[in-house]
């Protein structure tokens, strides 16, 4: 009809369509909720069914209401939502790498640490920091994670197993700093020398 012809003419003249641009700007609440760490499709639907329209609206709730809606890990995900979504510059990960290697060397000089993923592939930015430790004792992994916590480098624990740790780290190393840098998603995995070549490909 006439409106379609007008829309086509507008696109040809300006290269864009205001209505389309407006639609693009509107965020899909479900997609936005799923970006919160620990929130899956069913939880996202539950939040939408409650009438919550955005992450920003969810953040505006008081502490008691947030606790009634989200579990502990999801609350951490909401608190650090912007930090977790932010890309990490290659140069910043280099700083993490220097610190992490110095910590591991003090615990066990024979163990090795590699930052894998997009950092190892020389990408300009990364979504998180994937740390692979090559060591012959699980205790080294446990001591390493504990030292990161003691230093104040590891802000939040998201998951901890025998061979893998997931958390949020900050190069400011301590919550007492006036302006801490963004918290970064960090995954740490321990592997034996035999498993290492396969682990580096996976991680």
Q: Where are the model-predicted features located?
A:
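Short, solvent-exposed helix-loop connector elements
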Residues: 198-203
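A short acidic, often aromatic-flanked loop/helix-cap motif at beta-alpha or helix-coil junctions
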Residues: 61, 195-197
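Conserved catalytic core of two-metal-ion nucleotidyltransferases
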Residues: 150-195
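Accessory alpha-helical DNA-binding modules that contact the DNA backbone or grooves
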Residues: 2-129, 133-167
């Amino acid at each position: 009809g006439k409106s379609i012809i007008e829309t086509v003419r507008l696109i040809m003249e300006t290269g864009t369509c205001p209505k389309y641009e407006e639609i693009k700007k509107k965020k899909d609440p479900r997609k936005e909720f799923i970006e919160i760490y620990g929130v899956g499709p069913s939880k996202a639907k539950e939040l939408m069914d409650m009438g919550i329209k955005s992450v920003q609206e969810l953040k505006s709730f008081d502490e008691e209401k947030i606790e009634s809606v989200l579990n502990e890990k999801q609350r951490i995900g909401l608190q650090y939502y912007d930090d977790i979504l932010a890309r990490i510059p290659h140069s910043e990960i280099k700083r993490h790498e220097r610190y992490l290697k110095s910590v591991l060397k003090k615990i066990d000089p024979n163990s090795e640490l590699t930052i894998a993923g997009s950092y190892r592939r020389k990408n300009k930015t990364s979504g998180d920091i994937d740390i692979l430790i090559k060591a012959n004792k699980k205790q080294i992994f446990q001591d390493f994670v504990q030292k990161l916590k003691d230093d104040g480098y590891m802000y939040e624990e998201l998951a901890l197993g025998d061979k893998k740790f997931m958390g949020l780290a900050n190069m400011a190393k301590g919550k007492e700093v006036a302006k801490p840098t963004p918290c970064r998603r960090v995954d740490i995995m321990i592997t034996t020398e035999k498993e290492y070549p396969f682990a580096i490909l996976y991680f």
